[in-house]
């Protein structure tokens, strides 16, 4: 009698913050339901079981999702396209736009001011996205000096740290409350399913099947 082969373990990285609430129903549609302790707000655990014994979830910062997956510590993850673009890891494959977590990455500056234009060769920008920001300005012939901040970008112009900021914008309310105005949209952002390329090739029984289930779930939701 042949023994039943157990599926290979899969680690799935999901982000804390704005995308998580929208990601949970999507996970449920592909048959992945977190264990009860995942929803315990007092828990400091970072690794959680699911209803599928071979699949575990890790809940980490959005920027760390890409790093865990790119280096093979997790096989799959969910993260915003802003993070995928910022790191541009060659080891990452982003096969499915999940259609959630919509916002935009924008350039903003003081109300009444103009965006950088022709004739300007240098600008100082406060941002969480230095690589993306430099690329965007370089395409316009402007050298961007990026001040890396992980939060409170909106006060940088007021305190003289930078003339502009590049940050995620949803409603724009935070900009208005800090006397800033959105000047240019750099990119539209949505959440993506990301996969470690090596895991996609080596775990051919499980990982590609999960990718297809996500693709189907997104298609069904859009229908």
UniProtKB/Swiss-Prot annotation:
Domain of life of the source: Bacteria
Q: Please name the top-level EC class of this enzyme.
A: transferase
Tell me what reaction this enzyme catalyses.
1-(5-phospho-beta-D-ribosyl)-ATP + diphosphate = 5-phospho-alpha-D-ribose 1-diphosphate + ATP
The answer to keyword Transmembrane helix applying to this record is: no
Keyword annotations: Amino-acid biosynthesis, ATP-binding, Cytoplasm, Glycosyltransferase, Histidine biosynthesis, Nucleotide-binding, Transferase
**EC code:** 2.4.2.17
GO molecular-function term, one example from the UniProt record: ATP binding
Residues folding into a coiled coil are none
What broad class describes the main subcellular location of this protein?
cytoplasm
One GO biological process from the UniProt record? L-histidine biosynthetic process
Q: Name one Pfam family in it.
A: HisG
PROSITE patterns membership: ATP_P_PHORIBOSYLTR (PS01316)
Pathway info: Amino-acid biosynthesis; L-histidine biosynthesis; L-histidine from 5-phospho-alpha-D-ribose 1-diphosphate: step 1/9
Q: Which GO terms describe its cellular component?
A: cytoplasm
Enumerate the subcellular locations listed in this protein's record, separating them with semicolons.
Answer: Cytoplasm
User: For this UniProt entry, which segments traverse the membrane?
Assistant: none
Function per UniProt: Catalyzes the condensation of ATP and 5-phosphoribose 1-diphosphate to form N'-(5'-phosphoribosyl)-ATP (PR-ATP). Has a crucial role in the pathway because the rate of histidine biosynthesis seems to be controlled primarily by regulation of HisG enzymatic activity.
Q: How does it assemble?
A: Heteromultimer composed of HisG and HisZ subunits.
Q: What the record says about its domains? A: Lacks the C-terminal regulatory region which is replaced by HisZ.
Q: Which family does it belong to?
A: Belongs to the ATP phosphoribosyltransferase family. Short subfamily.
List the protein's name.
ATP phosphoribosyltransferase
